[in-house]
């Protein structure tokens, strides 16, 4: 039991009330962040967070903890840079050590096309607030002495974009710090409480049916990861979401400090070092949509082959454990946030492989939308209605792995 859990054990864990001003379904990072910001920024504390398992027990506790802002479209760069800056202040704001560590993230280019893409990424990042430059191979070698610039003779390192403020933070500490901050203000967090239906009157949501009984609400927000289409269907809403498994694995301790996060868009892979010195690696989503949390040996083989081409020192490491989460992917590889066509039903979803890095900004912006009834300018491009208006936020090149 960590210090968060020890302290939270002493909090009151009341039974669900019959009604709340706001009910948030999903007790992961996005749901807890919205509750935290409703309470701390807007004084709205008659809020319930419903979690069918335990706090952070879903994808918020399965991600690889990378924070970055080096996206490929202006709207995304602004949003994720804002979230990155909120992360930088979150330890001071919550009074909790979140193990936030600024490392920088390299996106390697292996071809002429890759060089053009990473140069363009650096330019658009700088134009919209993210600190990113393009680096030549010799500059990359200074940052990552372990890298093989020949790429094993198959994937030569031709350059990279470098997002200086790329970072990591401990996911469970982020989840529990937000939960603690919300609960201190009076928010109710109900673990082991599953949403089994949405209560409606006509086209207006009036509450949530749970396995512990009905709970009425002025506003219901879905912050579900994985089974969001099922919950949305209960509200009469069809979402353009497909859910795919995403695998990762971690090795034993590597004694030297491997400082940056290294990613390759061409190889669809990335690696960072944990606080314990382990090498943490991930790759692209599984192609077949599924809710399965099973991991496969083929993933280890395929990813290891790609990573060893760039970082041959890892051939002496051993795999300690492997796991799988699930990702809700939208057609344009961008999130879906804000109001829906169903009255009083808000949604934050489509976070794919990039949900952890968005937790502070997503919660802040969703809280503002709920508190004011207006869509904040920052998330207006990410409304669900963009698909009907044929205004996609296409950013597949930035969001395939992490």
Which residue stretches match the model-derived regions?
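Extreme N-terminal leader/targeting segments of oxidoreductases
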Residues: 1-22, 40-45
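Glycine-rich FAD pyrophosphate-binding loop
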Residues: 39-60
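Flavin (FAD/FMN) cofactor-binding and adjacent substrate-gating region
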Residues: 89, 101, 110-185, 190-191, ...
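Glycine-rich Rossmann-fold phosphate-binding loop(s) that bind the pyrophosphate
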Residues: 27-30, 52
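Central helical "cap/lid" subdomain
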Residues: 210, 214-259
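Dinucleotide-binding Rossmann-like beta1-alpha1 core, especially the glycine-rich loop
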Residues: 64-146, 268, 298, 306-308
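C-terminal catalytic lobe of FAD-dependent flavoproteins
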Residues: 308-402
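Active-site lid/adjacent beta-loop-alpha segment flanking the redox-cofactor pocket in flavoenzymes
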Residues: 253-346
């Amino acid at each position: 039991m960590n210090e968060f859990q020890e302290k939270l054990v002493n909090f009151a864990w009341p039974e669900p009330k019959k009604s709340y001003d706001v009910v948030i379904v999903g007790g992961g990072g996005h749901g807890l962040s919205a509750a935290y910001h409703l309470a701390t920024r807007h004084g709205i504390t008659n809020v319930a967070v419903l979690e069918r398992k335990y706090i952070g027990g879903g994808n918020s506790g399965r991600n690889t903890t990378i924070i970055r802002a080096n996206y490929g479209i202006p709207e995304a760069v602004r949003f994720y840079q804002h979230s990155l800056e909120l992360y930088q202040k979150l330890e001071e704001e919550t009074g909790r050590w979140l193990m936030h560590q600024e490392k920088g993230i390299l996106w390697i280019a292996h071809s002429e096309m890759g060089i053009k893409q990473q140069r363009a990424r650096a330019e658009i990042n700088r134009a919209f607030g993210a600190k990113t430059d393009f680096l030549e191979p010799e500059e990359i070698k200074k940052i990552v002495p372990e890298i093989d610039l020949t790429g094993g003779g198959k994937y030569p390192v031709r350059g990279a974009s470098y997002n200086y403020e790329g970072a990591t933070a401990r996911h469970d500490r982020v989840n529990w710090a937000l939960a603690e901050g919300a609960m201190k203000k009076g928010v109710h967090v109900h673990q082991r409480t599953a949403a089994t239906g949405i209560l409606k009157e006509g086209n207006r949501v009036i509450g949530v049916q749970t396995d512990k009984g009905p709970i009425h609400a002025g506003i219901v927000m879905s912050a579900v990861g994985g089974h969001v289409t099922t919950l949305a269907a209960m509200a009469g809403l069809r979402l353009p979401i497909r859910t795919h498994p995403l695998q990762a694995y971690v090795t034993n301790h590597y004694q030297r400090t491997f400082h940056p996060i290294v990613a390759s868009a061409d190889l669809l892979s990335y690696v960072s070092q944990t606080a314990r010195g382990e090498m943490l690696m991930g790759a692209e989503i599984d192609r077949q949509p599924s809710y399965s949390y099973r991991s496969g040996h083929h993933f280890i083989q395929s990813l290891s082959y790609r990573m060893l081409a760039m970082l041959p020192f890892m051939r002496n490491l051993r795999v300690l454990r492997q796991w799988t989460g699930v990702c809700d992917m939208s057609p344009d590889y961008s999130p879906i946030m804000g109001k829906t066509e169903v009255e009083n039903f808000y949604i934050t979803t489509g976070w794919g492989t990039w949900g952890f890095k968005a937790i502070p900004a997503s919660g802040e912006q969703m809280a503002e939308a709920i508190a004011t009834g207006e869509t904040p300018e920052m998330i207006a491009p990410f409304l669900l209605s963009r698909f009907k208006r044929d205004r996609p936020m296409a950013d597949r090149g930035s969001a395939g792995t992490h």
